[in-house]
């Protein structure tokens, strides 16, 4: 216990003390609901909803709701939630994170909290890390919900809109973070409200909350459309990159390293970047026949070369990605899973495809995007569960306003966590790992070995094969057998090698898993995997094949359950599951997750981390202290090193990396917050249109603003008619409002006309043309056209704006050299660009509404018939809205406004120059 805890007491303990009375109330209600018949218990949902309508908050019915669900779970599943699980459910209901160790029954905890919150009728989303868990948990817990007359849905990849809409309309919806996020983006691209699938974001329970809200927070959700064809530049740049000589450094010193003469590009291991040296730049200029690679005209070429050297120098096959069936697939660095459907952005994925010699895919165009941080902040109430969250508590508080409550285990954890064993070399480390595996294997103790990459897991597998030890390998190449492999990792004598065990979601039970053994036998009997899984599930079905398989499954399960119980006792006697870590992860949390696979529900277990001074974490982040220690240690590679200083270096290195990664995630969020403000405005406006809000008055307002903006562009100085560019104004509005004979004023007539007269003339004419259009088309049809046109224009402009903002972000970092905050600059310029986009939406909407052709018998109105040229209307003159300083001058000179008619506005030359440069760098 730290000094802070000694003085002030542990935060979790204080909060648990407040929750204790609610838990006790739930336990007191046990006998009340146990005495009810099934029908009476199932009818409690309607009664509780009725009470909720009368009472002010859900808290008033919470104890009854949890007690009802607890009794239902016992009757349906044979599992009665423990008191600690009730506490976990209360924590989730309160919108917090419940830290619960592996094997403590988080699925049942989510079931309790989801049921209680479903009583509001607003919907509950239970978020899992993959489709398998979403389907399995929804089926298992679905039986409880069906018993309680509560509807349940599951959202899976590949479902159509009707299936998804039905799932979202259920009281409780299970699904993955990807599907929930992508469906939100897709919903904000529809033209008709009936095409939306989601409803409001009321309450979410996020399973493996640290994996979803922390680890994946650096990767935004992006819906892409097909962009331009992939250019030959990727292949040419790759061929060139392969001729260059790389130099690897732990951390780059810009000046010293760029002057290196013996390397063409530098690989910075700590920052994971690749940078051309002077030598590399010269070779590029010669190879591609350009004078200056850094010239603005060569930016595309420079970008392709930079991505090619990163693909070849930084990105490692079987660590960062795998190649499967001619396709480059990203490997999640935290879980070791393949990230299906994800691609590296900014052309890096194409560069890797060129490197690996597979087909280079088309470049993509971003249609919609959001970060996980901003998606999950949409929920009115957010909660989560994980085995390890305390190390990231500060981030949960700062970003999501969530606190972390440690839930005590149902039984004490008796796992023995041994001190780290450190070796001088990697070879010595793996020799020791093999010896430890052999020692455990001899006595039948199951072993789970965690590795940090596919490459290391396969190397270890070869060593075990050489020793004749039968084992299973779980990594990104074998992810399709993931659940089966993990489920049997606790068998007597089992040896399992797994890449990054984070978020695996399947409990490792000592003695093996009766369910998975039964499933395997069903498939051997000829049942398909789909039928076997459904047979083991809880869904209601009339399918005869599934019912027959379910009968077989029950027999097999009963048989294997007895076997597993006997074997589990043998495994306990052998010491339980032994966890071996072969390298420290960048995050302490991932290490803790690996350890947490052992010692569930009071079972025995052990864990040891075997490390070497050659491990990436030690080598890259350990710094000079590790190097000095290596020089002074006079030990061979097979002798373990134990040192308090070494342990301290490891922990401080991990804290350093965690801090750096937090800053990266925070930086991503800072930029996305700018986009998020704009996204909320656009999506809110879209929703109002979808909800059927009458747009007609808004459209009339747009017409007036469009006219006024147009006049302001061409009549900048209202007092000097000689400067009026009436010809330019006429041409701008030709085909919409103006006709050829307009503005043919004599000098005398011109002297009597004000700028406001022009505005009034054009506004009046435009409104009359539009009124005639409404008369011809009919009010109902025109209003529907208005709705569709506005949505289409908004979507088109918003997509282009996303690209523009992305381009702005790429170059904005350079502003820091001018002592400017890049995020502040991004926000300011981003808002200017947003204002420009809104004006552009207005203009394009008006133009389309005036020119769109609708096949009707009646002809569209002619502008000449609506208003005769020369008619004026006198109104109060308003101050002209001037064009932007970087806009082309309306006088027609071809110069920028600030360097022409706007030059006399008191702007200093150096300020103008500075703004010119800013504009250019943002375009880059």
Question: What are these model-predicted stretches?
Answer:
Residues 444-457, 692, 718-720, 746-751, ...:
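Short, Lys/Glu-rich amphipathic helical modules
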Residues 879-898, 902:
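Short Cys/His-rich zinc-binding micro-motifs
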Residues 33, 321-329, 335-343, 572, ...:
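Extended, charged helical/alpha-beta scaffold domains that provide interaction surfaces
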């Amino acid at each position: 216990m730290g000094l802070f805890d000694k003085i002030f007491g542990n935060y979790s303990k204080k909060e648990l003390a407040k929750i204790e009375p609610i838990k006790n109330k739930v336990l007191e209600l046990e006998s009340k609901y146990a005495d009810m018949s099934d029908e009476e218990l199932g009818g409690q949902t309607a009664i509780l909803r009725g009470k909720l309508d009368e009472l002010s908050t859900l808290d008033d019915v919470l104890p009854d709701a949890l007690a009802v669900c607890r009794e239902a779970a016992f009757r349906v599943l044979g599992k009665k939630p423990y008191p600690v699980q009730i506490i976990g459910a209360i924590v989730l209901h309160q919108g917090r994170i419940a830290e619960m160790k592996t094997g403590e029954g988080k699925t049942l905890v989510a079931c309790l909290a989801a049921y209680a919150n479903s009583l509001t009728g607003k919907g509950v989303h239970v978020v899992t890390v993959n489709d398998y868990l979403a389907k399995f948990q929804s089926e298992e817990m679905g039986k409880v919900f069906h018993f309680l007359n509560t509807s349940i849905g599951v959202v899976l990849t590949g479902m159509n809109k009707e299936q998804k809409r039905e799932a979202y309309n259920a009281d409780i919806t299970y699904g993955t973070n990807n599907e929930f996020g992508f469906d939100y983006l897709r919903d904000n691209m529809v033209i008709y409200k009936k095409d939306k699938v989601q409803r409001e974001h009321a309450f979410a329970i996020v399973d493996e909350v640290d994996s979803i809200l922390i680890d994946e927070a650096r990767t935004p959700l992006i819906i892409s459309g097909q962009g331009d064809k992939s250019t030959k530049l990727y292949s040419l740049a790759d061929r060139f990159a392969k001729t260059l000589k790389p130099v690897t450094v732990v951390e780059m010193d810009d000046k010293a390293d760029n002057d290196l003469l013996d390397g063409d590009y530098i690989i910075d291991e700590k920052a994971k970047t690749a940078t051309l040296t002077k030598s590399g730049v010269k070779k590029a200029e010669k190879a591609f026949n350009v004078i200056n690679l850094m010239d603005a005209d060569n930016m595309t070429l420079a970008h392709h070369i930079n991505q090619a050297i990163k693909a070849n120098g930084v990105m490692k096959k079987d660590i960062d990605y795998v190649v499967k069936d001619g396709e480059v697939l990203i490997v999640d660095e935290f879980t070791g899973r393949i990230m299906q459907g994800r691609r590296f952005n900014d052309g890096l994925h194409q560069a890797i495809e060129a490197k690996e010699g597979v087909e280079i895919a088309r470049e993509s165009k971003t249609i919609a995007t959001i970060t996980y941080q901003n998606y999950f902040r949409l929920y009115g109430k957010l909660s989560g569960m994980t085995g390890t969250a305390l190390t990231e508590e500060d981030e949960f508080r700062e970003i999501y306003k969530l606190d972390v409550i440690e839930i005590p285990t149902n039984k004490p954890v008796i796992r023995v966590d041994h001190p780290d064993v450190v070796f001088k070399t990697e070879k010595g480390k793996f020799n020791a790992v093999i010896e430890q595996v052999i020692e455990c294997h001899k006595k039948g103790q199951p072993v789970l070995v965690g590795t940090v990459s596919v490459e290391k897991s396969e190397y270890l597998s070869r060593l075990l094969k050489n020793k004749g030890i039968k084992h299973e390998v779980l990594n990104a190449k074998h992810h399709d057998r993931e659940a089966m492999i993990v489920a049997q990792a606790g068998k007597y004598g089992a040896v399992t090698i797994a890449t990054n065990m984070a978020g695996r979601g399947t409990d490792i039970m000592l003695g093996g898993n009766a369910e998975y053994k039964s499933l395997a036998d069903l498939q051997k009997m000829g049942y398909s995997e789909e039928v076997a899984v459904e047979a083991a599930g809880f869904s209601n079905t009339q399918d005869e094949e599934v019912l027959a398989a379910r009968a077989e499954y029950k027999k097999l399960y009963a048989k294997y359950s007895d076997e597993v119980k006997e074997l589990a006792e043998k495994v306990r006697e052998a010491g339980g599951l032994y966890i071996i870590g072969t390298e420290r992860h960048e995050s302490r949390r991932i290490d803790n997750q690996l350890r947490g696979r052992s010692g569930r529900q009071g079972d025995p277990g052990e864990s040891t981390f075997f490390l070497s001074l050659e491990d990436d974490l030690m080598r890259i982040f350990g710094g000079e202290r590790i190097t000095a220690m290596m020089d002074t240690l006079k030990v061979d590679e097979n002798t373990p090193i134990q040192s308090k200083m070494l342990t301290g270096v490891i922990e401080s290195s991990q804290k350093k990396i965690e801090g750096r990664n937090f800053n990266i995630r925070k930086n991503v969020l800072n930029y996305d917050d700018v986009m998020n403000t704009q996204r909320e405005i656009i999506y809110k406006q879209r929703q109002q249109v979808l909800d059927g809000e009458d747009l007609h008055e808004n459209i009339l307002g747009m017409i007036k603003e469009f006219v006024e903006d147009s006049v302001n562009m061409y009549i900048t100085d209202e007092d000097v008619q000689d400067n009026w560019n009436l010809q330019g104004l006429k041409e701008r509005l030709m085909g919409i409002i103006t006709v050829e004979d307009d503005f043919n004023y004599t000098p005398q007539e011109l002297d009597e006309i004000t700028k406001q007269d022009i505005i009034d003339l054009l506004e009046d004419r435009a409104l009359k043309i539009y009124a005639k259009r409404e008369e011809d088309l009919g009010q109902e049809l025109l209003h529907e056209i208005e709705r569709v046109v506005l949505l289409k224009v908004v979507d088109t402009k918003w997509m282009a704006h996303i690209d523009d903002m992305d381009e702005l972000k790429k170059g904005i970092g350079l502003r820091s050299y001018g002592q400017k905050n890049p995020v502040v600059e991004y926000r300011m310029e981003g808002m200017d660009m947003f204002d420009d986009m809104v004006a552009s939406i207005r203009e394009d909407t008006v133009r389309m509404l005036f020119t769109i052709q609708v096949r009707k018998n009646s002809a569209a109105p002619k502008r000449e018939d609506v208003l005769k040229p020369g008619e004026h209307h006198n109104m109060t003159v308003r101050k002209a809205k001037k064009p932007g300083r970087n806009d082309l001058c309306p006088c027609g000179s071809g110069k920028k406004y600030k360097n022409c008619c706007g030059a006399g506005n008191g702007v200093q030359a150096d300020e103008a120059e500075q703004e010119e440069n800013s504009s250019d760098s943002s375009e880059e």
